[in-house]
């Protein structure tokens, strides 16, 4: 027995030793790719020495003899910290993910190839001015210099993910950066999804008057009546099965509910306590680990600029110089139209146009798939744009037999100069120069908020399609592509883009809300990203005569829900007082406890409170009950509560209370009936998910920010090292916006919000502050992978200074790039 025991101990010891060696070896391999920030590197294609000074928050301050060398340094710094992120985004826009990830990403690649964004990016290089092209070339050379260093010094292939996904890394090219701007346009444009959803809902609803309830317009003057979609595309079934967008974390395709959002506001000097203009900006995008944002400072010949960049794109997209500050918010401009193209019944290679049938423009495209046979696609284009497969965006449900769907979209411009406009903005010294730079900007359309030392302004930038006043659906639903009135007629002049310059009140801002109320076709959009946050913002701005940097920070971090304050009195009007206290343990008693909590609640979506969870679960269950009857399976796609819909129903606007009656039941249900039943539904769900002690609930447990790694975030064990999860306040409709997932077992997970926050005070520009939601590094073993995450969660910031001495005071490291001598 003793012998057996000794052998078991030896085997166990051996296994432990092997495990330790394995873990140690894996750590050693992964850690090889951690960048050495205190380093001197000899590189090619550099005219003079470049210094990358990383301050104590690891923000690189890049100094060089000329702009070309500075952009070279930015490329090197991006590749040091975010190489895997950069090449993954490049593969995404190229439609080449399947070369690395196999069949799991084929569906994503198929659709990206249809858009053909990378080919358009290569073509767009010809439209760029020499200065922009030189900057892109220099940036690419900086990225490639880091790749050369990795190969020469065997630095763990540059990122730990490279050890798991064996694929060659092609040199960076200027077109890659242009393509990433187009990829951002894809992620921020949701009108294609919205058009198809409106068409499907129109087909499903027996009463077309109810379409204005479930898909309400933002408050403002109305529009002319539109035809039913069944009239535009006859012969379609009332209901069709949903084909969801690709669920892969790598998918760039977003529903309209999860397209871009953002906040930005500015104060003139006479509304600022310091006497200088103020600006705040927090762009909202999907959360990832690392965040898409990367902080950097570039010391250009025109002066220093500092702010948020996106690795792969050599531009400060939101930030400031010593003279100008700028922020971006999604404009929600209607820059996409879906067209139903009729095939020639005698020749499927042709489609109908206003002048007769015409052949598709076609070419083959081959998708290489890891561990599988390659796939050959035939890409087809019409005059209106690329033909998209019916298997995406539910296009099959709204496309009659003998037809195909095509998309026109401003981002499909083969002479896209958006990146040149962004570079010109970095050199602008005044608001007027900043506005002028936006004329070259194409997509994605944004509201550009600007301040200089004297002036504040907001300008919508990006191409706005010129539509015919006789357009059948006004761009709100797919329309026949062979009718001339439905086709785009070019681009509206830049002067037609909304502009607000030095408003009399001294305050301006945007929360993706409706900015103008103009009749079609000069309307900008019928769909807007916000009707709620703007109300709270207006209240905060008006309650003070003068503002400070800190009051702007308070507004960015505000968690009071205007929506909760307005909806709860409406839906609970007949439920608050229901007689005597019910016995403990009964559903009636649980309902009374919930209502008592909500009655004393201020509407603050604080992570430590139970009321936000009760409220959110209640209104979610309420919308489900209201629409399930009429929409059937389509109701699942309305996965975020629309406050305007709930309000219309409970105020019975134009007969909207009809949604409260269940069509399949004999009794006539009322809206208070629906509210009571929905509250019971919500409490049952809460009990099953979080327990029955309502007073002990925490909103933050359900509303965790999910910064998940896009490729390894679902891998057991690794996900605990890669993913960054944080309990957070806020919600769908608070200024501290934490957009919820809306579906699945954790519908209130915070998946979309402000990955970057910045507030700039031009009375003392170097007192400006900014922060991102994870950290600068994309390497999970780096201290700088998540060091900013807790600051971000607590509402704290780091200094945003152009003071060179401050950057050099306690640097993380200084990387010197030295030109190679022949």
Briefly describe each language-model feature range.
Residues 523-587, 676-822:
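Terminal end segments
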Residues 70-73, 111, 119-136, 406-408, ...:
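Second-shell loop/turn segments in exported
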């Amino acid at each position: 027995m003793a012998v057996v025991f000794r052998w078991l101990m030896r085997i166990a010891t051996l296994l432990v030793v092997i495990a330790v060696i394995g873990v140690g070896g894996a750590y050693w391999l992964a850690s090889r790719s951690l960048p050495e920030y205190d380093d001197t590197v000899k590189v090619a294609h550099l005219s003079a020495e470049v210094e990358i000074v990383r301050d104590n928050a690891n923000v690189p301050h890049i100094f060089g003899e000329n702009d070309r060398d500075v952009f070279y340094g930015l490329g090197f710094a991006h590749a040091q910290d975010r190489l895997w992120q950069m090449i993954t985004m490049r593969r995404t826009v190229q439609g080449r993910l399947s070369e690395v990830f196999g069949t799991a990403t084929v569906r994503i690649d198929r659709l990206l190839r249809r858009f053909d964004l990378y080919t358009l990016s290569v073509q767009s290089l010809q439209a760029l001015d020499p200065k922009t092209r030189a900057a892109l070339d220099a940036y690419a050379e900086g990225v490639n210099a880091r790749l050369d260093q990795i190969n020469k010094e065997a630095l763990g292939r540059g990122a730990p993910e490279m050890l798991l996904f064996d694929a060659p890394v092609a040199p960076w090219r200027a077109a890659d950066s242009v393509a990433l701007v187009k990829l951002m346009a894809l992620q921020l444009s949701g009108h294609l999804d919205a058009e198809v959803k409106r068409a499907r809902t129109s087909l499903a609803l027996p009463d077309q008057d109810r379409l204005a309830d479930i898909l309400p317009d933002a408050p403002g003057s109305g529009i002319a009546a539109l035809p039913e979609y069944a009239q535009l595309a006859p012969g379609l079934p009332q209901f069709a099965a949903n084909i969801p967008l690709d669920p892969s974390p790598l998918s760039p395709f977003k529903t309209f509910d999860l397209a871009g959002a953002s906040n930005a506001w500015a104060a003139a000097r006479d509304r600022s306590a310091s006497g200088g203009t103020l600006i705040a900006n927090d762009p909202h995008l999907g959360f990832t680990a690392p965040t898409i944002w990367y902080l950097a400072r570039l010391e250009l010949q025109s002066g220093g600029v500092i702010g948020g960049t996106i690795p792969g794109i050599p531009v400060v997209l939101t930030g400031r110089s010593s003279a100008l500050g700028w922020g971006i918010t999604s404009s929600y401009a209607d820059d996409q139209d879906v067209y139903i193209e009729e095939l020639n019944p005698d020749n499927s290679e042709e489609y109908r146009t206003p002048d007769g049938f015409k052949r598709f423009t076609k070419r083959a495209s081959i998708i290489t798939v890891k561990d599988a046979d390659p796939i050959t696609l035939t890409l087809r284009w019409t005059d209106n744009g690329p033909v998209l497969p019916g298997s995406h965006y539910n296009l099959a449900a709204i496309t009659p037999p003998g037809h195909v769907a095509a998309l026109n979209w401003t981002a499909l411009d083969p002479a896209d100069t958006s990146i040149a406009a962004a570079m010109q903005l970095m050199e602008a010294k005044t608001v007027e120069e900043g506005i002028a730079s936006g004329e070259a900007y194409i997509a994605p359309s944004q509201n550009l908020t600007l301040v200089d030392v004297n002036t504040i302004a907001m300008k919508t930038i990006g191409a706005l399609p010129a539509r015919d006043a006789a357009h059948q659906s006004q761009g709100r639903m797919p329309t026949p592509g062979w009718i001339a009135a439905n086709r785009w007629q070019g681009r509206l002049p830049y002067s037609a883009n909304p502009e607000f310059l030095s408003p009399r009140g001294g305050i301006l801002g945007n929360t993706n809300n409706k900015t103008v109320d103009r009749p079609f076709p000069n309307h900008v959009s019928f769909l807007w990203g916000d009707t709620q946050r703007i109300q709270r913002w207006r209240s905060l701005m008006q309650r003070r005569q003068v503002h400070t940097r800190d009051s702007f920070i308070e507004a960015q971090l505000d968690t009071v829900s205007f929506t909760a304050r307005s909806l709860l009195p409406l839906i609970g009007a007949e439920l608050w007082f229901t007689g005597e206290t019910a016995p403990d343990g009964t559903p009636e008693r649980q309902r009374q406890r919930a209502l008592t909590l909500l009655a004393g609640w201020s509407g603050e979506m604080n992570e430590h409170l139970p009321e936000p969870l009760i409220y959110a679960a209640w209104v979610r269950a309420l919308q489900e009950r209201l629409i399930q009857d009429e929409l059937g399976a389509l109701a699942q796609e309305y996965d975020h509560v629309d406050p305007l819909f709930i309000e219309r129903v409970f105020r019975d606007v134009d007969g909207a209370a009809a949604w409260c009656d269940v069509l399949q039941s004999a009794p006539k249900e009322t809206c208070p009936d629906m509210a009571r039943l929905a509250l019971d539904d919500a409490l049952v769900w809460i009990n099953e998910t979080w327990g029955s002690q309502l007073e002990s609930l925490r909103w933050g447990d359900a509303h965790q920010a999910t910064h998940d790694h896009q490729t390894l975030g679902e891998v057991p064990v690794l996900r605990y090292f890669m993913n960054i999860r944080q309990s957070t306040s806020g919600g769908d409709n608070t200024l501290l916006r934490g957009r919820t997932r809306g579906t699945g077992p954790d519908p209130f997970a915070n998946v979309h919000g402000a990955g970057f926050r910045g507030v700039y005070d031009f009375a003392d520009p170097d007192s400006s502050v900014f922060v991102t939601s994870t950290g600068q590094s994309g390497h999970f073993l780096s201290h700088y992978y998540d060091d900013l995450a807790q600051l971000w969660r607590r509402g704290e910031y780091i200094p945003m200074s152009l003071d060179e001495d401050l950057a050099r005071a306690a640097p993380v490291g200084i990387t010197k790039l030295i030109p190679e001598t022949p």
